[in-house]
UniProtKB/Swiss-Prot annotation:
Pathway: Cofactor biosynthesis; biotin biosynthesis. This is Pimeloyl-[acyl-carrier protein] methyl ester esterase. The lineage of its organism: Bacteria, Pseudomonadati, Pseudomonadota, Gammaproteobacteria, Alteromonadales. It is an enzyme of class 3 (hydrolase). The keyword Cytoplasm applies. Monomer. Substrate binds at W20, S82, L83, F143, L144, A145, I146, Q147, H235. It comes from Idiomarina loihiensis (strain ATCC BAA-735 / DSM 15497 / L2-TR). The gene is bioH. The physiological role of BioH is to remove the methyl group introduced by BioC when the pimeloyl moiety is complete. It allows to synthesize pimeloyl-ACP via the fatty acid synthetic pathway through the hydrolysis of the ester bonds of pimeloyl-ACP esters. Residues 13-242 form the AB hydrolase-1 domain.
Length: 255
């Protein structure tokens, strides 16, 4: 199997998907506590961490999912952060028979800002695309800095995340570029009403990538879903507020 999945703990299965440029080590701050309650499946997305990109297809939400699904248990709760939340949303739409609940973290059905939609400014993602050609490790580090921006311990958080993710292999450069294109172009807004499983959305109040003002717009598209805002967090609430994160996730699964 070309997909790396680290499994730990016992109990109800929960699959966790990381974000762009990262790998499954990003979840380490909450793994010990979560594995006391769940059987945790920490996935390296294809082309990231220890997972190789093995599809002959271009990088897309569908080709990510096609490679991930055979490595997952028959039924599971699904937790996706940032780009991982976008992939998780697509899984919930296309494999609802296997998904017990969907929780997205600092994620959006459409990441890019436009006149009537709050998101990442298009020129920021365009700069990342250009910088990837010259120095992709530095580009990931810059992305980390933007993710942490606004949180009280931003500098410490960036340092912690670097230590976590750089212990695994660097991402495949082609997958890195093409998955950034997914962030630039994917739009699942019109499909959100079709999500049939319990749907919870976690946000950081200080997040500059998925701004707080986007929350109500997403709620309007998915009125059955529930939004939880972490007041002291930017883009990574599970790092900034791990205890509350675990508590909120336990509520999701217990319900």
């Amino acid at each position: 199997m070309s997909i790396s999945v680290t499994c730990c703990g016992t109990g109800t299965p929960i699959v966790v998907l990381h974000g762009w440029g990262m790998n499954s080590n990003i979840w380490q701050p909450v793994v010990p506590a979560l594995s006391e309650h769940f059987q945790l499946y920490c996935v390296d997305l294809p082309g990231f961490g220890d997972s190789v990109w093995s599809s002959e297809n271009d990088v897309s939400l569908e080709s990510f999912i096609e490679q991930i699904m055979p490595a997952l248990p028959p039924r599971f709760h699904l937790l996706g952060w940032s780009l991982g939340g976008l992939i998780a949303t697509q899984i919930a739409l296309t494999h609802s028979d296997r998904v017990m609940s969907l929780t997205t973290v600092a994620s959006s059905p459409h990441f890019v800002e436009s006149n009537d939609w709050a998101g990442i400014k298009p020129d920021i993602l365009e700069q990342f695309q250009q910088q990837l050609d010259s120095n992709f490790k530095k580009t990931i580090e810059r992305f980390l800095a933007i993710q942490a921006m606004g949180s009280e311990d931003a500098r410490e958080q960036v340092k912690q995340v670097k230590q976590l993710i750089f212990t695994k292999p660097m991402p495949d450069q082609g997958v890195l570029k093409q998955s950034l294109t997914i962030l630039q172009t994917a739009d699942l807004r019109q499909q959100l009403p079709n999500i049939e499983v319990p749907f919870n959305r976690f946000y950081g109040r200080l997040d500059s990538l998925v701004p707080e003002r986007a929350i109500d717009d997403i709620s309007a598209l998915a009125p059955e879903s529930k939004a939880v805002v972490f007041t002291k967090s930017a883009h990574a609430p599970f790092i900034s507020e791990p205890e509350r994160f675990i508590s909120e996730l336990l509520k999701v699964v217990e319900n």
